[in-house]
Design a protein with these regions (language model features):
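Structural microenvironment flanking redox-active thiols in thiol-disulfide oxidoreductases
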Residues: 1-38, 47-53, 208-210
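Tryptophan-centered motif/residue detector
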Residues: 4, 19, 54, 62, ...
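Secondary-structure boundary/capping signal
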Residues: 12-13, 43, 80, 99
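Short amphipathic alpha-helical patches
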Residues: 31-32, 59, 77, 111-118
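Thiol/disulfide oxidoreductase modules built on the thioredoxin-like
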Residues: 37-42, 47-92
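Non-globular targeting/processing and membrane-anchoring segments
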Residues: 85-227
Length: 227
């Protein structure tokens, strides 16, 4: 999106983002502003906390792209993280319809890194996994989760693929698990090029200190960006 916004700005393309939160922490404007700055997003981003934009487009998934022509008509929409070449070709066609000239026929090749890198779907055998009890699946610690209560868990010794567990004292609520005593541990057996974990401090402006082990050792060159 950033590349398209820069490449086609002078040809008349206007990019507007809409952030529709999935979790409660995503409703906070400060969190969204921090993410926008961190990702160096320069086009405007609307915070759609009440899902008005989502519902008006009858949207069904994150992310989604909608291309609107100069007359305000939706001419193309796409769900998911793929087919970027096709989307860009439609952008070019709509700009030409509106009188743009001199557009290159090639599409943008972006070699993004870190959290912006395109997913490797050919080797991604692990789905999005939720820690909160509302959507959690494949919990492998032997203890049964008591909702919204502090309890001590035992980490699974050899979890199956896409199974996970906790160790030490946690309070598992609908959307997250809150560590009660330090240290604690999350164990997850996954198969994917990338693993992203959402962490947040109990108090604002406090850093979250954590250690990542991959197959019991430091990840070394496989260490991610930490953003």
């Amino acid at each position: 999106m950033k590349s398209w916004a820069a490449k086609y700005k002078d040809a008349g393309l206007v990019v507007i983002g809409a952030h529709t939160p999935e979790f409660s922490f995503e409703h906070e404007p400060m969190n969204v502003e921090t993410a926008v700055r961190s990702l160096k997003v320069t086009f405007p981003v609307a915070l759609d906390s009440d899902y008005r934009i989502w519902r008006s487009f009858d949207n069904q998934a994150w992310p989604a792209q909608y291309l609107v022509d100069a007359k305000g008509r939706i001419r193309y929409h796409h769900l998911g993280e793929s087919d970027y070449g096709e989307i860009e070709r439609v952008i070019q066609e709509l700009l030409k319809e509106n009188g743009a000239t001199g557009l290159a026929s090639d599409t943008t090749g972006v070699s993004a890194v870190g959290i912006e890198a395109a997913p490797d779907w050919t080797d991604a055998l692990s789905p999005e996994t939720y820690i909160g009890y509302r959507q959690a699946l494949n919990f492998a610690s032997p203890e049964r989760v008591h909702k919204d209560s502090i309890q001590v868990f035992t980490a699974p010794a050899k979890p199956s693929l896409n199974h996970w567990g906790l160790r030490e004292s946690w309070n598992v609520n609908a959307e997250s698990a809150l560590l009660q005593t330090v240290p604690g541990k999350i164990v997850f057996r996954f198969h994917s090029r990338d693993l992203h974990l959402v962490l947040a401090p109990a108090k604002e402006a406090k850093p979250v200190r954590f250690v990542v082990r991959l197959d019991g050792a430091a990840p070394g060159e496989n260490c991610g960006s930490g953003q």
